[in-house]
A protein has these predicted regions:
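RNA pseudouridine synthases
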Residues: 1-101, 184-193
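Short histidine-centered loop motifs in beta-beta connectors
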Residues: 105, 111-119
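A residue-level detector for short acidic-glycine micro-motifs
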Residues: 42, 82, 106-108, 167
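Residue-level signal for inorganic ion chemistry
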Residues: 2, 52, 78, 104, ...
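Conserved hydrophobic positions within beta-strands
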Residues: 80, 103-106, 139
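A structural micro-motif recognizing beta-strand termini
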Residues: 81, 118-121
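Pseudouridine synthases involved in rRNA/tRNA modification
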Residues: 108-111, 125, 131-195
């Protein structure tokens, strides 16, 4: 599924009911589906891009296990404030006391920001956002881990897009290579970044 920005994957404790999962299950039931779709991982509300859903709980458990064993390759596109000193590297800083590692490579440098390919090898909550903040280059649009007033570039949301997922299917053993284009709002930002 290519998740749009602005939707949660699952409900929060605030009981927000309209989530990507609820919308998908309503749609599938209206088409006569006899199963529920279950998310195999999560993306932040503001993050757009690929998310895997499974048909039923047993399929979900198999995919979740692949994530746990780090057998799924994930790649994101991020826009980071300013320009990174190292154009390629690995950030290995703990997140909430747990080991976390994020590989990155600058794909293109714009006037006030870098476009970065990001490959987390662990899946801590907000890992990418925290790691780039710690480098002194928070994501463009960041409000939770940086003060927007401290940075020249503004965006309506965090500029982070889940672009690639690669893994071996747990049942068929076939190679699965998923990708999706950059979200339209991020494409628009690239064409006309705010002053």
């Amino acid at each position: 599924m290519d998740k749009p920005t602005g939707l949660l994957v699952i409900p929060t404790p605030k009981k927000e009911k309209r989530t990507l999962t609820s919308i998908l299950n309503e749609e599938f039931k209206s088409r006569g589906a006899e199963y529920n779709l279950h998310p195999c991982h999560r993306l932040d509300r503001e993050t757009s891009g690929l998310i895997i859903y499974a048909k039923g709980k047993s399929a979900q458990k198999k995919i979740v296990e692949l994530f746990r064993q780090k057998k799924i390759i994930k790649a994101y596109t991020a826009f980071v404030q300013g320009h990174l000193k190292e154009h390629k590297g690995i950030i290995k800083n703990p997140v909430e006391g747990q080991n976390a590692a994020t590989s990155y490579e600058v794909i293109e440098s714009k006037k006030d920001f870098d476009i970065v390919k990001v490959m987390p090898s662990t899946g801590r909550t907000n890992q990418i956002r925290i790691h780039f903040k710690e480098l002194g280059h928070p994501l463009v649009g960041e409000r939770k881990f940086a003060f927007r007033k401290d940075y020249k570039l503004k965006a309506k949301r965090v500029c982070l897009h889940a672009e690639i997922l690669r893994f071996t299917h747990p049942v068929t053993n076939e190679a699965v290579d998923l990708s999706c284009a950059l979200a339209q709002d991020l494409e628009k930002f690239l064409k006309t970044p705010p002053d």
